Amino acid sequence: MSLNLENQGNLIAKVMKNEKDTNMKLYVTDKENTVRNGGNSFECKPDKSLQIVPNNKTERQCLYVCGQSGSGKSYFTTNYVKEYKKMFPKRNVYVISSIAEDKSIDSLKPKRINVLHPDFMFDEFTAEDFKDSLVIADDVDVFPTKIKKKYLQLLIVFFR
């Protein structure tokens, strides 16, 4: 595997400076012989950062974002959603959560599914409901047990 800035392989991230795109893009390839200056690690300069971008060459992509309260999970997710909406402006974004709002993510106008709403337990979701969309599951660890079971059934639908 080789990380590179040479447009070889799959795009995985953009190099940002002050939240602005620098036009440098990070790629990953397993064809190491096609890359002149690749490597197995990449380090940004102190004034730059990486923004993960959706992979439009795969049918499905799953990210697991975790961290302590205040660590920047919503900030990271919001920026990822912005990149997703740039690539796929007509696709839906869903937030499945027990929390009524998240100002950061809600600024992007996702469709919210509140797991604490009484209808959630009776809604029958299909894979078609979420086809070609981005689904964010927020604070699943605090879902009541009964709702977690329903949510896990929903995950099975997603991955079929």
Predicted regions and their residues:
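N-terminal pre-Walker A segment at the start of P-loop NTPase domains
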Residues: 3-54
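Residues immediately N-terminal to the Walker A/P-loop in ABC ATPase nucleotide-binding domains
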Residues: 58
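Conserved P-loop NTPase motor cores
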Residues: 61-83, 94-103, 111-160
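Conserved SF1/SF2 helicase motif Ia
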Residues: 88-90
